């Protein structure tokens, strides 16, 4: 359930971040945990390294942008490495994340990515309700625990 996952994520963050950083997060400042998959452009592109500066090779010889994505995939042995890399990069450039998420006040706190969208909805541009609920819950419990009374 999103509530349990959010509580676990907060426990992990408590090991990784200082009290001041957690309090700032409760006040709306995104934590910098090295996650490059955040942004705020409408229908934003893939912002992580998937298919932009990294790839995975599958057991059957396909090049895919990320270990969490089954497609797009290009057969390396049939097309050659350079052509497969160009194909994966071109296909990843065409992927757009949900426009509905771009205007969300919590977008900079969200772990939305193309793989999570596709895994939950079957599309890259449809909002994954689980990730959305998880983000809202994590922000709420962080505010409850680390927010300051004004």
Predicted regions and their residues:
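C-terminal accessory region of radical SAM enzymes
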Residues: 1-43, 62-112
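Short, small/polar residue-rich loop motifs at catalytic or cofactor-binding pockets
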Residues: 48-52
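Short, acidic, Ser/Thr-enriched surface-loop or helix-capping motifs
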Residues: 57-58
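Sparse recognition of residues in long alpha-helices and their boundaries
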Residues: 76-77, 113, 120, 148
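Cysteine-cluster motifs in flexible loop/terminal segments that predominantly coordinate metals
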Residues: 95-142
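Iron-sulfur (Fe-S) cluster-binding modules
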Residues: 142-150
């Amino acid at each position: 359930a999103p509530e349990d996952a959010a509580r676990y994520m907060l426990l992990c963050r408590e090991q990784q971040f200082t009290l001041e950083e957690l309090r700032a997060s409760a006040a709306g400042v995104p934590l910098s945990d090295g996650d490059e998959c955040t942004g705020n452009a409408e229908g934003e592109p893939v912002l992580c390294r998937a298919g932009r500066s990294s790839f995975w090779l599958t057991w059957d010889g396909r090049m895919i942008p990320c270990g969490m994505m089954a497609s797009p995939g290009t057969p390396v042995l049939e097309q050659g490495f350079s052509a497969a890399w160009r194909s994966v990069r071109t296909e990843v450039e065409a992927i757009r994340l949900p426009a509905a998420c771009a205007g969300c006040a919590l977008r900079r706190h969200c772990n939305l990515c193309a793989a999570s969208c596709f895994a939950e909805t079957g599309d890259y541009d449809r909002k994954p309700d689980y990730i959305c609920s998880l983000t809202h819950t994590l922000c709420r419990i962080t505010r409850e625990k680390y927010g300051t009374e004004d």
